[in-house]
Amino acid sequence: MSNLNNLRHKLQNGLIASCQPVPGSAMDTPEIVAAMACAALAGGAVGLRIEGINNIRAVRRATDAPIIGIIKRDLPDSEVRITPWLEDIDALSAAGADIIAFDVTCRERPVSVADLYQRARATGCLTMADASNIDDGLLAHHLGIDFIGTTLSGYTQATVPTEPDLALVTQLAQAGCRVIAEGRYHSPALAAAAISAGAYAVTVGSAITRIEHICGWFCDAIKQCETEKLTEY
């Protein structure tokens, strides 16, 4: 089995932990990101999604588990945020990423999806498309991108849904894509539903690694219960 096939095999039917702290939070240091990654692997995760060169370097030093690497940028002339530039591809490969993920949505962008893909292939890394809908995903699949993620489904519109896009997982899987389900998988049951829908693997982020979000969910539920009690009287 080749190294690339071995990497694909490691991820199949597994959990990928996205270790991306809230920017600027108490957890937002490379050392803590690496610790979160190791804890996720100890819990059974088979791969990691890591943002930022320093974070990837820290995680690479700590483990040889598969890393999906991204760089997020806020550009003045494009809504594309995930790995928008060719130099990002080079930097991610040099930092130790095994798989390079990039936005493949049909929006104004500084570099074409095809050029990003070709640059990533030239590094020897596997590739992942962060798609928002079936058209994005199929275009990426036809280019030859290794994994198609549902990462951006619901995030290119004004209102973000609360539930994951399982229908998109099914559509892409039926089209022959290796689908990495991602986006709003906040419970084990939803992650299992993604695999049942045909996902190759499932990425979970906030529900595992963003303490602020998790605490917020609990606090909101408690407040809702308190409100319901008050309305009974």
From Swiss-Prot:
The keyword Isomerase applies. It is an enzyme of class 5 (isomerase). The keyword ATP-binding does not apply. GO terms for biological process: carbohydrate metabolic process; N-acetylmannosamine catabolic process; N-acetylneuraminate catabolic process. Its EC number is 5.1.3.9. It holds the Pfam family NanE. It comes from the Bacteria. It catalyses: an N-acyl-D-glucosamine 6-phosphate = an N-acyl-D-mannosamine 6-phosphate. InterPro entries: Aldolase_TIM, NanE, RibuloseP-bd_barrel. Keywords: Carbohydrate metabolism, Isomerase. Pathway: Amino-sugar metabolism; N-acetylneuraminate degradation; D-fructose 6-phosphate from N-acetylneuraminate: step 3/5. Belongs to the NanE family. Converts N-acetylmannosamine-6-phosphate (ManNAc-6-P) to N-acetylglucosamine-6-phosphate (GlcNAc-6-P). NCBIfam families: PRK01130.1. This is Putative N-acetylmannosamine-6-phosphate 2-epimerase. It comes from Yersinia pseudotuberculosis serotype O:3 (strain YPIII).
